[in-house]
Each structure stands twice: as C-alpha cells, then as structure tokens.
Amino acid sequence: MFKLVATDMDGTFLDANGTYDKKRLQKVLAGFKEKGILFVAASGRSLLALEDLFSDFRDQMAFVAENGSALVVDGDLTFEEHLTKEQYLEITQLLTSSPYMNGHDYLLSGKNGAYVHQDASDDYVTFISNYYENVQRVPSFEEVDDVIFKLTANFTAETVREGEKWVTERLSYANAVTTGFQSIDVILNTVTKRTGLEALCEQLHIKQEEVLAFGDNLNDYEMLEFAGTAIATDNARDEIKAISQEVIGPCEDASVMTYMEEMLDDKKRNSDYCY
C-alpha cells in the first residue's frame, strides 16, 4: 500500500504554463487523506514559490523544495541543507567567469527570497520571476543576508549539458544538475531530491516500497531510484524512462493528476496500487 506520493513539478505535474487544476487536486487530496496517503511536491523550485503555488493546500501536503535542500512538513521546516556564504560567493564568481554564461544571468535561492545581481538582464529577471518569489536585485552578493540553498543559472539548449559539466568539474563541494528550461541548479553534492524525500520517510516511518514518485528530468533521478515505484511522463528524458516501472502520458495532458485519480477509483484500481 502506498503511503506517500511524490511528484516533480515542471515537466511532470504542471503544464507548460506552470499551472494545474485545483478542483481536481482538491478531490485527490481528500481521497488521499481517507486512505492515509501523503502528497508531496518535490521540486527544484524555491520553498517560497512552492508554498505559493499550493497556497490553498499547504496544510494537506509536504514540500521537498530547492532540489532536496529544504523539507516542510505540517508547515514546519524539518530539514535543510544550505551553502555557506563563502561557498555561494565562490560559485557566483565561477558562474560569472563561465564561457557558457550570459553575464550575470543567475540567481541565489534563499529562505526569505531570491537574489540576482543588479547587472542581470531584464529578460532573465522577468523569466526567473515566474519560478521564484520575492526576487531582489542586489549590487553585490556580499550584501545578501539570508540562508542560501542553491544557485540557478540558465544556458542555451545547446550548451546546458556542457555548462553543467563545466561547473561541476570546478567545485569540490557542489554539483550542477539540469532541471529543465535549459537551466542548472548548483547545490551541495550531498543533496538531491532523494535527500529530502528520504528525510521525510524517516520522520514519518514510511518504507521505500510505500513510496510512489513521478519525474521527468535528471534532477529527479535519485528520487525515482529511491521510490518503490517510479513513473515517468512521456516527455521525460530517456534516462528517467529507463529507471521507471511505467511511462504515462505527457505533462500537458495532466497525466500525473489522472493517474492519482485512478488510484482512488475502485473501478479502475488494479493490483499495482496494492490497496
């Protein structure tokens, strides 16, 4: 029997506009509550952005945010891993010097807000504000007074994998991971979405085989490996499909929502759901 259902957001649960059907989710969460199943949003998005995205349901779910760096259960931050100031300042200097970067088009994701350099392009700030809350321009990252979970940077579709490798090769304590939208997140190399999900399972005494997870991109890989049942969307990368027990429809068809609804439908339920 599943006790926890975790899903990635962009490219998995959300459509191309970053939205979902709230009425359908409300019904799913009511059904999950009856069956003792916890719904978890697991994303590279910031904690602030996730809590805003699910503002109507915050007390009915858990959040694995910042690619596993922050875990919120029952409204409380119960687990976090963050960069030191020395570390994130070094990473900003590295990104600025990268041949794959466009100037200062990168962001620091913190507990209280998100921070971009005052020289970041307007186009980048407009784009990134769709995924982060309280985006602030600062003249120097030295002035940032916040807990920083990760950095995120955008590349072109042609250079994102090269940029990811270039950054990772130059840091001993952090990795760059592709997250979709031609972007990378730079996080501590001890942290993945699995880290946050595993911490959640330990806190709630949930076994791996009781976990169902959905994903599409490489930053979902470890989470799907951890889950007892892994499911990829049709638009997922081949590496993700290869480790999944099932491939469902694309995110544009709200396939994850449909799957969860069918989990609660006695007529459509099959032995895979194990109730």
Model feature map: region roles:
Residues 1-4, 22, 185-275:
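Mg2+-dependent phosphoryl-transfer enzymes with acidic/Ser/Thr/Gly-rich catalytic loops
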Residues 20-122:
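Active-site phosphate-binding/coordination module
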Residues 36-40, 59-61, 149-150, 209-210, ...:
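Short active-site oxyanion
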Residues 57-59, 67, 170-172, 226-227, ...:
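Short, structured coil segments at secondary-structure junctions
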